[in-house]
Amino acid sequence: KKSIEMELPLFAGFYESDGYYFLVFGQNNMDESDTVEVIRVVKYDKSWNKLGAAQIFGANTQKPFASGNVSMADDGTNLYLRTCHTMYKADDGYNHQASIMMQISIADMKVIYNNYTVSNTSHGYVSHSFSQDIFYDDSTGTVYATDRGDAYPRSHVLMKYTNLGSEYFSSKTANVTIMSYGGETGDNYTGSYVSGLEVTGSTILSAGCSIDQSNYSSSTKRNVYVAVVDKSGYKLDKIVNLSAYAEDGTDNALRPWLVRVSDDVFAVLWETDISKRQVHYAFVDARGNILASERVVSGTLSDMKPIVKGGSII
């Protein structure tokens, strides 16, 4: 057991690569100063000896990680990090929230790319962005990311980065709309959660739960789904529903987790009421075919992604 001191007031995430551990810290920048360190990514060896850090100053950031999370992936050479922030005050007097995408060289922890400015989805920018997931596909050298946006775009969106290693990710991202949301542009309520991104040999899987968006104004019950995107054609193949909770029922899905069990088996876990202390789960294959329909066991989920260890999901 070893205690690691907080390097900045906010702790935002942990990631393990083949050779290193990474911790992400941050601090608010209420004066909007370009000299304030807002994000620090610290590299450790597997004995938790500190080896280096990437430090981000200013970066158009008032509050790092605000209303979102941190997701990381690596290709052995680079660490890719997707998160979010509230930005410096805009001309309209508001501090708008949006996604951030970073690429960091693992060897020297140099920040190679940091997209923190106002942009659009053709450059992987989402605003507001309320959940972020990232995955590196080593078979194609591609980074995929998903976000839950409430305005630009107002959807569960998948993005693909192919020109990695360049200073500015100079090629534009290719985007797939997985699910469009009802309501007005910028309305924070979307009736949905998005959590989980996995890439297989032929597909990209992303999990979520949502109200019936076609009845946005009246629907209140969220159901769990897995979206299947064809990797070769890069288009949405289908959305597979894993629950069927009725509007007049008591069950209402909370944030699901997508967990890779093997190359062709994926678990989706969720809760409907934290007080019940029950975990719902189902299994699908790489094409989204249901291998085992919804079942329930005693337990609870944390805000950390479950992992597979010793033949069990924990």
Q: Residue ranges of each PLM-predicted region?
A:
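Extracellular, repeat-based ectodomains that mediate carbohydrate processing or recognition
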Residues: K1-I314
